[in-house]
């Protein structure tokens, strides 16, 4: 019988098979295949990294929350109409502006794992489970934890990633006596075998243990024990692919230089024909094509929006698993799950075809979206450019 430590037995987590998928290629984890982003693809975002590094805890978290749009009632807050307007020469999906606005309102009514234990939430959530408040987390440690959480998340559900992060955090506190929990210095004291044991439930855990320790050593030797602040420096780290790099850059440094395309964004944008599935064989190709037309003002939030929908239509997911990470006084822990489940079923039934999804959102009168947005189209007619979307869509979302 396999020996399970107290850290790896905190929850019963299914071990994911080592499989290679089109939308989550195993090659993203290989350090030999490095991706260099062309300079012309980068969207300028004025962020003074030295200034960010100088921010104390309170000011840093206040700034990064606003910068990433992770504010209360984010999805229920109407967008500035100008954000959704695109040039007349840009082809956009059928009824995109109206549908996107309604999607945001519907998104405000559902709770998904990404909302509790997503890339930027997981360090704070895990720390609170270990008695470390947000006020006690240094910005440098937070940035490290964002990076490590993103590295662990590849081909792994958020709930499983959160448990692996919790294992590391508790080991750093209990065994290494690190009062701050998961710091660079503490992680470097963990040997590879032990780290592999702590993260055994995530996909490719043995490989990730090696990459994490190698990455931490590089951060110590080459980046003054902090996370790199450019896309190509992040892509130079072992096991870090474009999705991980863009997400880390956004969540840790507030730099929006590209869209983070994970399996959910990849599948839904192909399903709805927001991108050409025949030309987008990898998530990075999906990212490039999506960036060609999606208004830049939406690059920050598109991942969180679609990931939330993608997670709740995954039939194999037990959404109740995420509640264990909520503190008892969190109002989200007392949600009416009967109503949530009914809403999830409606979404599952209607999201599989974009024309059907549009009609579903148009019929949801209780969403009260009349004040959400009033966009003047610069296109001649949106319907003419995407008339093919009226046909049945053959792409199906896998579990």
From Swiss-Prot:
Induction: By oxidizing agents. GO terms for biological process: base-excision repair; base-excision repair, AP site formation; cellular response to oxidative stress; DNA repair; nucleotide-excision repair; positive regulation of mitochondrial DNA replication. It catalyses: 2'-deoxyribonucleotide-(2'-deoxyribose 5'-phosphate)-2'-deoxyribonucleotide-DNA = a 3'-end 2'-deoxyribonucleotide-(2,3-dehydro-2,3-deoxyribose 5'-phosphate)-DNA + a 5'-end 5'-phospho-2'-deoxyribonucleoside-DNA + H(+). InterPro entries: DNA_glycosylase, Endonuclease-III-like_CS2, HhH-GPD_domain, HhH_base_excis_C, HhH_motif, NTH1. There is a cross-link at residue 194 (Glycyl lysine isopeptide (Lys-Gly) (interchain with G-Cter in SUMO)). The keyword Transmembrane helix does not apply. Keywords: DNA damage, DNA repair, Glycosidase, Hydrolase, Isopeptide bond, Lyase, Mitochondrion, Nucleus, Transit peptide, Ubl conjugation. It is found in: Nucleus; Mitochondrion. Residues 1-26 form a transit peptide. Transmembrane segments: none annotated. Residues 223-247 form the HhH domain. Its EC number is 3.2.2.-, 4.2.99.18. Its main location: nucleus. GO terms for molecular function: class I DNA-(apurinic or apyrimidinic site) endonuclease activity; DNA binding; DNA-(apurinic or apyrimidinic site) endonuclease activity; oxidized purine nucleobase lesion DNA N-glycosylase activity; oxidized pyrimidine nucleobase lesion DNA N-glycosylase activity. Changing residue 364 to R: Cannot properly relocalize in response to oxidative stress. Disulfide bonds: none annotated. A motif (Bipartite nuclear localization signal) lies at residues 14-37. Monosumoylated. Sumoylation is associated with targeting of NTG1 to nuclei containing oxidative DNA damage. Disruption phenotype: Greatly increases spontaneous and hydrogen peroxide-induced mutation frequency. Causes mitochondrial genome instability. Suppresses mitochondrial point mutation rates, frameshifts and recombination rates, probably because NTG1 can generate mutagenic intermediates in yeast mitochondrial DNA. CDD domains: ENDO3c. The record marks 262 as: Important for catalytic activity. The keyword DNA damage applies. Does not possess a consensus sequence for a C-terminal iron-sulfur center typical of all other endonuclease III homologs. PANTHER family: ENDONUCLEASE III-LIKE PROTEIN 1. Belongs to the Nth/MutY family. This is Endonuclease III homolog 1. It comes from Saccharomyces cerevisiae (strain ATCC 204508 / S288c) (Baker's yeast).
